[in-house]
Amino acid sequence: XVGDLKTPAILRVTNAYLFN
């Protein structure tokens, strides 16, 4: 769901922040 849609978006932002 919906959680499956929100969580990847958060992970992308988090990963972008951490791996920059």
Curated annotation (Swiss-Prot):
Induction: By progesterone.
Subcellular location: Cytoplasm; Nucleus
GO (cellular component) term, any one: cytoplasm
Keywords attached to this entry: Cytoplasm, DNA-binding, Nucleus, Phosphoprotein
PTM statement from Swiss-Prot or TrEMBL: Phosphorylated.
Tissue specificity as recorded in UniProt: Uterus and embryo.
Transmembrane segments: none
GO molecular function: DNA binding
Its biological purpose: Binds DNA.
Family, similarity comment: Belongs to the EF-1-beta/EF-1-delta family.
Protein name: Implantin
